[in-house]
């Protein structure tokens, strides 16, 4: 079952069996033996080196196979599968439930199709030779297998860099194996499932419309005409989804249509193109998932066919890319680098970059107001009684405090920094956050230590601002992070990170990070993991 239809949309299923002997039992195993020896090791550094070698092996196999594909029609077959994947995603948003085995693989399947398509930009293609669909299908299936293991080992490596001694490696009957240590795989799986609901959070709904308006204002174009001419030109030649166009005509036509310069229109379109000049290597595509030089952000796949530059643009791909740019780049001061040559677009990006923390903070503030928690927001100084000067904290070594919130009943004060992070869905992205939080920890710790020693300052501030009639000098101070979307730091950070959906319950004390119970059959005991889950040894009780 390699190729099926779901609501008339074709999709590949992941298949191990045709390739496991070639690429794993023989290929990878022999490669690791030749490079590292016939080894069993639990040593963290040795395991990391071997995981990186596995990643390298599958990248090389993927690259070798794809560089052999020099027919344009092969990449058109992949393109049509990718178009179908976008259609299926749209159906999912409307409520379509994919079969469980398809649903779990679907996000990675879409990434691998994009990875394959991006490589076409590196290859001198020809339309003068063809390839049969079944043969192309077999190659696509093989690339899907290889791409899956590229992503898998990138994830293994990322987790291993975040968790001390996450994995061990060994050989079983001359076949290489890699496994989690300490039940971490099952633990991580349960945590991801438990916190999956936390992805259902708010986003900047106005960002897409604002982006389109900024494009019109700064490139002096009509956005609908800019995008609308692409299907018109395609249909002039044929009604095929995979009809290509010559990209040079787009800025010329739009400049004439909008009475603006071709410099403006060329900058706009070049920011939407992925080409040989700007595409990433296979390694960087996988390890830098938020780079703007990827097909997810650049919908115009541009390559050379028989010495002519052509662009392949999907019917729904521009809309997908614009949504991703609006939701997952501009708030983090990123956009297509060509657009950064336009001062107005830079100004727009900087404005959105300054807004994103405020958007999250506004939502958090609503929670505190609704639940009548005394709180301070964006505090740079504390008001004092009896005419005393304010106490400043926006100084070197401390800095503005995003939130302080008080729960009288629990005799607890929470001091928090707010982090509006990109949405992350695998360990490669999580690791970026994990590294960043190392710096955030030092800052929030300094603020917590200061506040713990200066509760009288906060006491007077709250009396002035909220007229509280109770003392807080014996309250416990807890440092936490408020975040918009789940990330691995939540599970293993020094300080707890609370998503928007759980802030109310955490502050009021009705929810906390759960204890995870796992069964250890080999030692006939139950293991109990608590936060931080991957840093503390679990407690154990024997089977009854």
Segments (PLM) and residue ranges:
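Active-site beta-strand-loop-beta-strand hairpin of nuclease catalytic cores
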Residues: 405-425
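Active-site metal-binding core of divalent-cation-utilizing nuclease and nuclease-like domains
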Residues: 377-401, 405-410
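Short helix-loop-beta junction
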Residues: 365-375
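Composition-driven low-complexity segments enriched in polar/acidic and proline residues
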Residues: 1-351, 481-544
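A structural signal for isolated positions on well-ordered beta-strands in alpha/beta enzyme cores
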Residues: 402, 414, 478-480
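Catalytic cores of nucleic-acid endonucleases
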Residues: 420-482
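A short, highly charged nucleic-acid-interacting micro-segment common to nuclease
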Residues: 342-364, 433-439
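Short, solvent-exposed loop/turn segments at secondary-structure junctions
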Residues: 382-384, 421, 485-488
């Amino acid at each position: 079952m390699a190729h099926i239809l779901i609501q008339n949309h074709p999709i590949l299923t992941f298949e191990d069996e045709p390739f496991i002997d070639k690429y794993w039992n023989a290929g990878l195993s022999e490669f690791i033996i030749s490079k590292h020896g016939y080894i069993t090791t639990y040593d963290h550094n040795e395991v990391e080196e071997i995981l990186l070698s596995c990643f390298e092996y599958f990248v090389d196999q993927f690259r070798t196979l794809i560089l052999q594909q020099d027919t344009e029609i092969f990449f058109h077959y992949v393109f049509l599968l990718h178009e179908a994947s976008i259609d299926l995603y749209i159906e999912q948003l409307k409520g379509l439930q994919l079969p469980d085995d398809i649903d779990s693989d679907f996000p990675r399947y879409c990434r691998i199709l994009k990875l394959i398509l991006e490589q076409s930009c590196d290859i001198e293609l020809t339309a003068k030779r063809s390839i049969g669909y079944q043969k192309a299908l077999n190659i696509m299936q093989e690339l899907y297998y290889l791409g899956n293991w590229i992503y898998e080992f990138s994830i293994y490596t990322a987790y291993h860099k975040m968790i001390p001694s996450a994995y061990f490696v060994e050989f079983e009957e001359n076949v290489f194996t890699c496994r989690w240590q300490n039940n971490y795989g099952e633990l991580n799986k349960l945590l991801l499932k438990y916190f999956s609901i936390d992805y259902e959070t708010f986003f900047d709904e106005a960002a897409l419309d604002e982006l389109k308006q900024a494009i019109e204002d700064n490139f002096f174009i009509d956005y609908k005409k800019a995008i609308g001419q692409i299907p018109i030109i395609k249909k002039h030649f044929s009604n095929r989804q995979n009809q290509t166009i010559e990209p040079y005509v787009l800025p010329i036509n739009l400049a004439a249509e909008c009475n603006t310069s071709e410099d403006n229109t060329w900058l706009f379109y070049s920011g939407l193109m992925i080409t040989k000049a700007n595409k990433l290597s296979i390694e960087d595509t996988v390890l830098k998932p938020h780079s703007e030089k990827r097909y997810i952000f650049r919908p115009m796949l541009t390559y050379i066919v028989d010495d002519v530059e052509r662009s392949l643009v999907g019917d729904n791909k521009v809309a997908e890319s614009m949504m991703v740019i609006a939701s997952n780049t501009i708030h983090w001061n990123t956009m297509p680098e060509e657009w950064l040559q336009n001062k107005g677009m830079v100004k727009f990006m900087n404005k959105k970059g300054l807004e994103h923390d405020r958007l999250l903070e506004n939502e958090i503030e609503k929670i505190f107001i609704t639940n009548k928690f005394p709180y301070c927001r964006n505090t740079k100084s504390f008001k004092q009684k009896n005419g005393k000067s304010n106490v400043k904290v926006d100084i070197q070594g401390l800095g503005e405090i995003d939130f302080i919130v008080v729960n009288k009943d629990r005799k607890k004060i929470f001091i928090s920094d707010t982090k509006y992070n990109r949405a992350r869905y695998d360990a490669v992205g999580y690791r970026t956050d994990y590294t960043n939080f190392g710096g955030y920890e030092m800052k929030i710790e300094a603020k917590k230590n200061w506040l713990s020693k200066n509760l009288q300052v906060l006491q007077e501030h709250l009396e002035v601002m909220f007229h509280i009639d109770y003392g807080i000098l014996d309250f416990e101070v807890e440092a936490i992070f408020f975040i918009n979307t789940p990330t691995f730091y939540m599970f293993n950070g020094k300080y707890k990170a609370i998503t928007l959906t759980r802030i109310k319950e955490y502050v009021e004390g009705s929810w906390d990070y759960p204890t995870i119970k796992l069964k250890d059959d080999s030692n006939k005991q139950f293991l109990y993991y608590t936060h931080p889950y991957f840093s503390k040894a679990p407690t154990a009780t024997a089977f009854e």
